[in-house]
């Protein structure tokens, strides 16, 4: 494997010195880019794009050709694991992801297989290997998975949900069934992320998109507990360097201390958490990633720069900050505004890293 020419992102996650704050964007390979839409049209549909290593590599690289980003993120979907378990993932136009065979009872959970990442999910590993070759050491590659709780929301609800009534019914009426499902998912995620690391992912991230819908007690029992199990099971050294692990619970700002205690290297923040407050609370234990509201990218470039400046000042001097949005970039953001954001982070952050 090639030596990394730019390891700013990996260094920041380990709270090591950098020359400027590294930046990448959640969903940086996506529908806001016309070239992404063109490639997706060639693939035919979203999952065909994910399952074609060459096309997945192409869309992963597209934002890097436009912007001086400090990391690439694997182009895939969090629902690859439930799909590999046989739930029958499909996408309804305007409805998002759906499953043909959602989980309804304990018997459904008991018969779920734990997928072999090099077999049922081999297309993901092929994409990781293809992207690493194409990157040729330019920037690190981030691998990722959904958290067990977040995967369970889709598997039990049968797709996207606003109220999560089916899953919460299971959580309160049949908690042991849900624990069995979450435990199987945690085992699957460990295998999946370790396979991504062996295939070439240099950092991994666990997306807990729906952890924020839980009470504090339930978050610890049904979400954080299983992310902790995953962190404990991950390969943390590969290719002669540490493989940093980032946890991100959207809406989880009140639980940062407990998240930091899992042994992860970094925490993702959404835009509802003040980054100065987060640093005061956990900055001696973990790096922080975030946390500009993605909607700021609708503003003119001068306003975007102002927001970047405010967040940099809020985090303050020193190491341990990876700049990002607080969630994924919106599909109708002008590409030039994303460029203004990336350039502003690099231009304005250097003074915060001078000794």
Swiss-Prot record:
SUPFAM superfamilies, alphabetized: UROD/MetE-like
CDD domains, alphabetized: URO-D
Keyword Glycosyltransferase attributed: no
Keyword field: Cytoplasm, Decarboxylase, Lyase, Porphyrin biosynthesis
PROSITE patterns recorded: UROD_1, UROD_2
A biological process term (GO) from this entry: protoporphyrinogen IX biosynthetic process from glutamate
Any GO MF annotation of the entry: uroporphyrinogen decarboxylase activity
EC number: 4.1.1.37
Pathway annotation: Porphyrin-containing compound metabolism; protoporphyrin-IX biosynthesis; coproporphyrinogen-III from 5-aminolevulinate: step 4/4
Localisation per UniProt entry: Cytoplasm
Quaternary structure note: Homodimer.
Listed name of the protein: Uroporphyrinogen decarboxylase
Source organism per UniProt: Yersinia pseudotuberculosis serotype O:1b (strain IP 31758)
Lineage of producing organism: Bacteria, Pseudomonadati, Pseudomonadota, Gammaproteobacteria, Enterobacterales
